[in-house]
UniProtKB/Swiss-Prot annotation:
One of its GO terms (biological process) is 'de novo' IMP biosynthetic process. It holds the Pfam family MGS. This is Bifunctional purine biosynthesis protein PurH. It comes from Variovorax paradoxus (strain S110). The IMP cyclohydrolase activity resides in the N-terminal region. GO terms for cellular component: cytosol. GO terms for molecular function: IMP cyclohydrolase activity; phosphoribosylaminoimidazolecarboxamide formyltransferase activity.
Length: 535
């Protein structure tokens, strides 16, 4: 008995060629609406579902395939005599292949100006119903929900006349995953809408925090272990990754990425993306230990490394410009876990292939988005999620950027243009340092970083000690504090270390006391009005 394929797709990529190949194998074609017309116009013999069921499409196409002749043909188990007898009694033919992709709900709601009515009309009913039926009966029915599966299916059909159980099961799992993703997207969209009973319609605005959140991720790879060897781990990505994000990285060489590599690489990449000029960020344990800008990648790296050569050992290095041979030669003198950049010259790649040890360096390439570095803003995470016991904390991501016009000078002494530039640089870096964060900067480079201390005083002292160990003078430096100084003692510590200007959010009950102390010490203080806690 000839096999039958039911084809009904919204995305028609590759479907005509696939249907032609199925026809060449003697497989009968069933189809609906626009798909049927496409196949018929190409000269393929195709039976409309309405002719197959004897029941016309109705309700503006809302009811097409919701019929026993369709679902009976998909759900009937060929190995159960009772099932076979039942479909024969009711004149139901079996369906062996189902090729369906769904109404483009996700693409519709992503469009500017999408209304609730637009969204509702793009909720597929018949497609998911057929997919579930076919996926449930995977031993007898192959269900294809993505054009990427066509080649796999066709190769097996041409080789052996049928799909293997392994392939059918894999397709079934993919189908259920697709339905879960689809229903999750609908739930997320509708859960974020407030219905205004007074006017009988939905609000035109949507909440960023829906009543129910349906996290949907795809596994990229299993990892050797988690943060520690006794922990198991895997790396997942969003269903639709943003351009220029870490998950789009291509590993050009080196060992397999570890859990800690990925966590640190993300911290480095997000920081370096925030600079418009050539920049280098070196990260250790999710904290920047050296950040600098320069005329090119080589200069930026040299300055960043100079901040804290000890901590840079075994670090993660990120650039926002391609790496050339000169820069690679400088990096190769150190032990590096991960190197990441938008690109590499052949000379740079050759440096890391020169010895077996250098071949272990994990070299990642993250292609620039179509709009170049300026388009990286579009690839930032919009939400941050943190797991707590049996729950999640969700917040909008800290993507706030500061301009010179946003600053409020609160001291008698005014900042010079050079000091303003250093203050803005220090503030940008401080956002990526674990709280409590104190960052000394000068000349487009970090001079000392104090991170993750319970006391702001201790962070300031550590930053000063780091600079001393690196042989750097803090005289005349700019200092950023990610949160306000609760007392003047923190200010005194950074000024004693050599700072000439300070940027902090303000907002303390003792702001005036701290400002008066700045005037007393003869330093500049500006307020950002924004806090950058990072935990």
């Amino acid at each position: 008995m000839a096999q039958t394929a039911l084809i009904s797709v919204s995305d028609k990529t590759g479907i005509l060629e696939f249907a032609q190949a199925l026809h060449a194998l003697g497989i009968k074609l069933l189809s609906t609406g626009g798909t049927a017309k496409l196949l018929a116009d190409a000269g393929l013999p195709v039976t409309e579902v309405a002719d197959h069921t004897g029941f016309p499409e109705m309700l503006d196409g809302r009811v097409k395939t919701l019929h026993p002749k369709i679902h009976g043909g998909l759900l009937a188990r060929r190995d159960l005599p009772a099932h076979v007898a039942a479909i024969q009694e009711h004149g139901i033919d079996t369906i062996d292949l189902l090729v369906v992709n769904l109404y483009p709900f996700e693409a519709t709601v992503a469009k500017a100006g999408c209304t609730l009515e637009d969204a509702i009309e793009n909720i597929d009913i018949g497609g998911p119903a057929m997919v579930r039926s076919a996926a449930k009966n995977w031993k007898d029915v192959g269900v294809l929900t993505d054009a990427s599966q066509y080649a796999v299916a066709l190769a097996e059909l041409q080789a052996g006349g049928k799909l293997s159980d392994k392939t059918k099961f894999a397709f079934s799992v993919a189908a259920f995953n697709r339905i879960a993703d689809y229903d999750g997207a609908i739930s997320d969209y509708l859960s974020a809408i407030d219905f205004d009973a007074s006017i009988g319609q939905a609000s035109p605005t949507r909440s960023m925090f829906p009543a129910q959140s349906n996290g949907r991720f795809v596994k990229v790879q299993d990892l050797r272990y988690g943060e520690n060897p006794h922990q198991q781990a895997a790396f997942y990505r969003d269903l639709h990754p943003a351009p220029g994000s870490l998950v789009s990285a291509k590993q050009l060489q080196g060992k397999e990425l570890s859990y800690n590599n990925i966590a640190d690489a993300d911290a480095a990449w997000e920081c370096v993306k925030s600079f418009d000029v050539p920049a280098c960020v070196i990260v250790k344990h999710a904290n920047p230990c050296g950040v600098a800008v320069g005329k090119d990648a080589a200069e930026a790296y040299g300055k960043a490394f100079k901040t804290d050569p000890t901590s840079a050992f075994g670090g993660i290095i990120a650039f926002n410009r391609p790496v050339d041979g000169e820069t690679a030669q400088a990096i190769a003198k150190q032990f590096v876990e991960v190197l990441m950049a938008p690109g590499y010259t052949p000379e740079a790649l050759a440096v890391f292939q020169a010895t077996k040890v250098k071949q272990n360096v994990r070299v990642l390439e993250i292609a620039l988005p179509p709009g170049g570095t300026t388009d990286w803003d579009n690839g930032r995470n919009l939400m941050d999620v943190k797991r707590v016991g049996s729950g999640l904390l969700m917040q909008t991501a800290d993507n706030h950027e500061l301009a010179a016009s946003d600053l409020k000078v609160v001291t008698k002494k005014q900042p010079t243009p050079e000091q303003l530039q250093d203050l803005l640089f220090a503030w940008k870096v401080a956002k990526y340092v674990k709280s409590n964060a104190i960052v000394f900067c000068a000349g487009g480079m970090t001079m000392g970083v104090g991170a993750g201390q319970m006391s702001r005083l201790d962070s300031a002292r550590i930053a000063s000690i780091k600079a001393e160990h690196a042989g750097l003078s803090l005289k005349g430096t700019a200092v950023a504090s990610d949160a306000f100084f609760p007392f003047r003692d923190g200010l005194d510590v950074v000024v004693d270390a050599g700072a000439s200007c300070v940027i902090q959010p303000g907002g303390s009950m003792r702001d005036q006391e701290v400002i008066d102390a700045a005037d007393e010490r003869g330093v500049v203080m500006v307020l950002s009005g924004v806090r950058h806690f990072r935990h």
